[in-house]
A protein has these predicted regions:
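Cysteine-clustered segments with highest specificity for TGF-beta superfamily mature ligands
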Residues: 117-165
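A short beta-strand element within beta-rich, extracytoplasmic domains
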Residues: 70-88, 165-169
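Solvent-exposed serine/threonine-rich low-complexity stretches and specific carbohydrate-binding patches
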Residues: 107-120
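Short beta-strands within extracellular/lumenal beta-sheet-rich domains
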Residues: 46-69
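Sec-dependent bacterial lipoprotein signal peptides
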Residues: 1-19
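Short, surface-exposed beta-strand/strand-loop-strand elements in extracellular ectodomains
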Residues: 87-105
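Post-signal peptide N-terminal segment of mature Sec-exported envelope proteins
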Residues: 27-50
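Bacterial lipoprotein signal-peptidase II cleavage site
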Residues: 20-26
Length: 178
């Protein structure tokens, strides 16, 4: 009986060690939330005339809602932006913002930026893969709600549309053991 008990304890210990050292991995399709509200597309004009917005309305993404009992180890974001240029030659910068306070989304530094050189009548596809967001942004993804904003800026006299075609966040969480 004692041998079976020791075997069971050893098997459970091995299983626990093999589970990734207390890590959980979550994959959030941020694009699906943005597409559902038609916030995946943003026109751009350069130079920007007065009164023309360069941002989408802030969008709500349901996140993990784990709270402070865990630590975010890694937040990898990847996807693709298409710059559908109708006129002019220049560069478009597509910036993505995250925050847990809706009113603060556009007040900070963007989480990441994607650039694309554009020419008239051509769609420029710009894939991106950000291996890990800045440390200051990682705790945001433990909240139950994360707000997302998108801004475009341009150089040159150009016009067109920036269309997000994919945006995923892969979040690696580690339990706190202290």
């Amino acid at each position: 009986m004692r041998g079976k008990w020791l075997f069971l304890v050893a098997a459970l210990t091995a299983a626990a060690i093999g589970c990734g050292q207390g890590r959980a991995i979550f994959d959030i399709d941020v694009f699906s939330f943005l597409r559902a509200t038609n916030a995946d597309t943003l026109p751009y004009v350069g130079p920007l005339p007065p009164g023309v917005p360069d941002t989408i309305p802030v969008q709500t993404i349901k996140s993990l809602g784990i709270g402070s009992s865990s630590i975010v180890d890694t937040v990898r974001v990847f996807g693709t932006v298409d710059f559908v240029n109708t006129s002019g030659t220049g560069t478009v910068t597509f910036q993505v913002y995250f925050d847990t306070a809706k009113s603060a989304v556009y007040t900070g530094t963007p989480a990441f930026s994607v650039n694309g050189a554009v020419t008239p009548g051509v769609t420029t596809t710009s894939p991106f893969d950000i291996p890990d967001l800045p440390t200051a942004l990682k705790p945001l993804f433990l909240a139950s709600t994360v707000y997302v904003g998108i801004r475009v800026s341009t150089t040159g006299t150009i016009s067109g549309t920036a269309k997000l075609t994919a945006l995923r966040a892969r979040i690696v969480i580690q339990d706190k053991f202290f």
